[in-house]
């Protein structure tokens, strides 16, 4: 009989989290994801249209016992357009549990733009763990550590200089935010 049938789903104890990379165009959001997930870098600039979701499975050490927790991180790469950000905010940002707000360390005008991204996301999901990343750190930096400290003090979040090209601090950024989200979800 049909009523006796059950859908059997694979059981998993893997925690799933949704992280969003946000910021203006051409700051390296897609390249950071590529470096983190695939361990490589592509010199070509390819604009993201709409959104692109990539996943990576991690084993995260948590707690005093350093217990390994299996985590599936879903990384949402959002097109750097303000118009799209505001138009599609409910669709893209619903369920976001952490933000990597990315600016270009060589273009200081990209740092204050992050405030608009943060406000838009927070309107949808509330105050979630956030890291500010000043990407392209392998080049001559036009944003000083002091500027980043002042900017991030208002947000109450850490910042890192990252380089998708060399891999500098990329793993640290994604792993750090993942742990912050897990601590936020399970206080």
Predicted regions and their residues:
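TRAFAC-class small GTPase G-domain
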Residues: 1-187
């Amino acid at each position: 009989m049909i009523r006796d049938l059950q859908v059997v789903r694979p059981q998993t104890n893997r925690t799933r989290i949704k992280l969003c990379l946000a910021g203006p165009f051409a700051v390296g959001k897609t390249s950071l994801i590529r470096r983190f997930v695939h361990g490589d870098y592509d010199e070509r600039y390819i604009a993201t249209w709409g959104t692109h979701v990539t996943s990576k499975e991690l084993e995260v050490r948590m707690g005093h016992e350093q217990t390994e927790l299996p985590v599936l991180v879903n990384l949402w790469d959002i097109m750097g357009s303000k118009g799209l950000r505001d138009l599609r905010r409910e669709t893209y940002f619903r369920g976001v549990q952490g933000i990597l707000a990315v600016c270009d360390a060589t273009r200081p005008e990209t740092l204050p733009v992050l405030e608009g991204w943060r406000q838009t996301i927070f309107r949808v999901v509330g105050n979630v763990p956030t890291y500010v990343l000043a990407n392209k750190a392998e080049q001559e930096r036009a944003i000083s550590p002091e500027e980043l400290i002042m900017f991030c003090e208002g947000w109450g979040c850490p910042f890192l200089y990252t380089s998708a090209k060399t891999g500098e601090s990329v793993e640290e950024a994604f792993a750090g935010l993942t742990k912050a989200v897990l601590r936020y979800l399970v206080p």
